[in-house]
Structure formats: structure tokens, C-alpha cells
């Protein structure tokens, strides 16, 4: 039976735990560490997992160790648990869920030959609809990578990418839910401005985003094709699209994505 250690029981760590248990993993095979004793007890009571405060204890004989801590703590935690990982009877795989920390930095902080996987998650994994990209280190074999992918698939889709694409991936997936939340927020405000009750405007906007996303995913059609299907000549939708285009919506997204990628690259150099 696979044993999982989750170092850090924040939002991402809890989402992972929730997904694993929903996929019928035995909670007693999941160890979660927290700095806060209260938070640890909360997760234990909610999911029945093993709550620990010692990272090395959690990593002891764990098959996969997920690092769900802030980027600034990744190297510190790796240094803390590397001795334990060296003594495990089978090779453990370390999976970083933090932005900005390269595979090279992690491999240099651990013992030689440690299998390391770098993941860029996003927050929709909190509701089982995440998008996680995975990048394997030099010492990760095909079986280990497949195991990590299977575990991550419990909280959404998984895609393997090259590390050179991580900054672009951050802009397109890691941070993009926030862009869509902002667009939804603006659409709700527009509805209120038109006289709709806020609750009604929110329901309409959220349902429209959900439906549009499902159409793009399930029909296989290009977004431009689906948009054209809603845009009758000289109709209401065309009038709205014209205003958005003239307001520079495409350029705004280009610039936002570039700014995000640039910032990701900058953080990765620290």
C-alpha cells in the first residue's frame, strides 16, 4: 500500500488529501504535517489522516513526499528530511507544489540521486477541477512519474511539460484562475449596473462561465468557432464583442500573461 507524506496542510495540501481520500486511499496511509497543532487536529478530525508535527517522521518510509509549503521553505524542508529519505528502504519521490523553485535547486539541496518532480498546481484543485503540470528531475523513472500523475489526477487534470515552459505555464494555468475570477467579478458588476440584483447577476455570470468551459472541453471546437455560433449578424452579441475588442481586451490578456511569466522567471532566479 502506498504511503503518502504531505508536508504542509494548507489549502493545496488539504485539497490533495481530500482528493486522495475521495479516490479511496486509506487515510491512515496519509501523513500530514502542520506547524499549527490546531490545524493538524482539524485535518485529522475531518479526514482521519495521521497528523504529525515532525517532517522527518512523516517522510520516514513514505513512498511519495509532497512539499506543500511556501517556496521560501522548500530548500529548508528538503535539507531537513534528506537524511530520512536516504535511510528509507525504498526510494522515495519528492514532489514540490511550490512556484519558483527549480529542479536543480531541489536536487542540490538533497542527497545525490533523489527523484524530484516539480508541479505547478492551480486552486481549482480545491474542488477537484485543478490543472497540474508535472516536470520530472533527472533521477525520476517512468514508473515513479506515472505514480505521481495518478495521485495528482485525483484533484483534476495532469499534463507533463518541460521545465523551460514553467514560466508560461504559470501565466496560463497557475495564475489564470485569478484572471477569470476578475472577469466574472466585472461581469457581475455590469449586471448590477444594468439593474439586476447582485445574486441574480452572479448566478447568471457563473453559470455562463461554467457552461462555456464545458462546451470548449466537450465539443472539441475552437473558442473562436463557439463564439461565432453565438454572434448573429448585427445582433446583441456582436455589439458587445465589438466593445470588448475596441477596449483592447486581447492586448490586456497578452500583457497580463507576459507580466506573470516575467515575474515567475524573476522569482525563479532568487
Curated annotation (Swiss-Prot):
Subcellular location: Cytoplasm
SUPFAM superfamilies reported in the protein's UniProt record: 6-phosphogluconate dehydrogenase C-terminal domain-like, NAD(P)-binding Rossmann-fold domains
Xref: InterPro entries: 6-PGluconate_DH-like_C_sf, NAD(P)-bd_dom_sf, P5C_Rdtase_cat_N, P5CR-like_CS, P5CR_dimer, Pyrroline-COOH_reductase
Gene3D superfamilies in alphabetical order: NAD(P)-binding Rossmann-like Domain (3.40.50.720), ProC C-terminal domain-like (1.10.3730.10)
Keywords assigned by UniProt, alphabetized: Amino-acid biosynthesis, Cytoplasm, NADP, Oxidoreductase, Proline biosynthesis
Major location (coarse): cytoplasm
Annotated coiled-coil segments of the chain: none
Repeat listed as a keyword: no
Catalyzed chemical reaction(s): L-proline + NADP(+) = (S)-1-pyrroline-5-carboxylate + NADPH + 2 H(+); L-proline + NAD(+) = (S)-1-pyrroline-5-carboxylate + NADH + 2 H(+)
Recorded family membership: Belongs to the pyrroline-5-carboxylate reductase family.
Protein name as annotated: Pyrroline-5-carboxylate reductase
Encoding gene (name): proC
Amino acid at each position: 500500500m502506498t504511503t503518502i507524506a504531505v508536508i504542509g496542510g494548507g489549502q493545496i495540501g488539504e485539497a490533495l488529501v481530500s482528493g486522495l481520500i475521495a479516490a479511496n486511499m486509506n487515510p491512515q496511509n496519509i501523513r500530514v504535517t502542520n506547524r499549527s497543532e490546531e490545524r493538524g487536529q482539524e485535518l485529522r478530525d475531518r479526514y482521519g489522516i495521521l497528523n504529525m508535527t515532525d517532517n522527518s517522521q512523516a517522510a520516514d518510509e513514505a513512498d511519495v513526499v509532497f512539499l506543500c509549503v511556501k517556496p521560501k521553505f522548500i530548500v529548508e524542508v528538503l535539507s531537513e528530511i534528506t537524511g530520512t529519505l536516504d535511510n528509507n528502504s525504498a526510494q522515495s519521490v519528492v514532489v514540490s507544489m511550490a512556484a519558483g523553485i527549480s529542479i536543480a535547486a531541489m536536487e542540490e539541496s538533497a542527497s545525490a540521486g533523489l527523484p524530484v518532480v516539480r508541479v505547478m498546481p492551480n486552486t481549482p484543485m480545491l474542488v477537484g477541477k485543478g490543472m497540474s503540470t508535472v516536470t520530472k528531475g533527472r533521477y525520476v523513472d517512468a514508473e515513479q512519474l506515472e505514480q505521481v500523475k495518478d495521485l495528482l489526477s485525483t484533484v483534476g487534470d495532469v499534463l507533463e511539460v518541460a521545465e523551460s515552459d514553467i514560466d508560461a505555464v504559470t501565466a496560463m494555468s497557475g495564475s489564470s484562475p485569478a484572471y477569470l475570477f476578475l472577469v466574472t467579478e466585472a461581469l457581475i458588476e455590469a449586471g448590477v449596473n444594468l439593474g439586476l440584483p447582485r445574486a441574480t447577476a452572479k448566478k447568471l455570470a457563473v453559470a455562463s462561465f461554467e457552461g462555456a468551459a464545458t462546451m470548449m472541453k466537450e465539443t472539441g471546437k475552437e473558442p473562436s468557432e463557439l463564439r461565432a455560433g453565438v454572434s448573429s449578424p448585427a445582433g446583441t452579441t456582436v455589439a458587445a464583442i465589438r466593445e470588448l475588442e475596441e477596449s483592447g481586451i486581447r492586448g490586456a490578456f497578452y500583457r497580463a500573461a507576459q507580466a506573470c511569466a516575467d515575474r515567475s522567471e524573476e522569482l525563479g532566479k532568487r
